[in-house]
């Protein structure tokens, strides 16, 4: 008769073997896993699993310097950090160029150690063409974060191949030196290595709202209430991608500005108004405010002209935390010298 302790030992070994095949974030180490399966609320465009980038073919490497790395603190979604890119270089076998000033890196750390990342870039190739990039990534912890890259390149160009295929990146961000490296691989033909661990599934703590991928859309019955904030935003010249896989794309970089009203402060350099000019034209402006007393607030203002909706993300312990839970509406941008002016309102029904 087998001793109970021996049975327990055998069961433990079997469980260890099983956990090598399918793990869960917070319960095991994701390093070396064939796939990281994202949480359904942050699918990264590859809901069935993100492969190891190094299993593919290197497409390019970007070396960037950072203008700032802002520790926002604990927001309604988790522990938030935002990095703003000052500029960078892009080198690869098929594409070379630069990373434009103002790219954004949003990093979210959840209570169980899970990491979620969103990045927004504009690249400029050596022959002067612009490429709009938006990436979503995740990892069980900071040791293995994988970014799924989505490119919008000009369809009538020799880099139109970026519009197809599957690309996964690996980023290394050093807040102390204010540098970031991004290596992007084509994993379209990548196969999991035989005998390696199969998948790690991302889990999330209960009761925490998921961060949104898209901007909020106003309900038909919403209307403008009390005036909240007026902002003036200074802008750089447009960076036009032109016709691409989702329609004509145009980017207008944000270089600064100021805000008055219920909140006083300034618009920080970085981010942009990311426009899709397919009818009906839409904008998705992403940028940062800094209040007069030093609080950093993440701002997003998106939608079609005539129905723009701003949303906010700020530290939950701050005196501006009411921004996290309210609903708001925005005016259309009005032309001002060197930029635009906007007014934000409380939303009523």
Describe the predicted segments one by one.
Residues 9-19:
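Bacterial N-terminal signal peptides
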Residues 31-349:
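Beta-strand-enriched cores of mature, soluble protein domains
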Residues 21-32:
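Signal peptide processing junction and immediate N-terminal pro/mature segment
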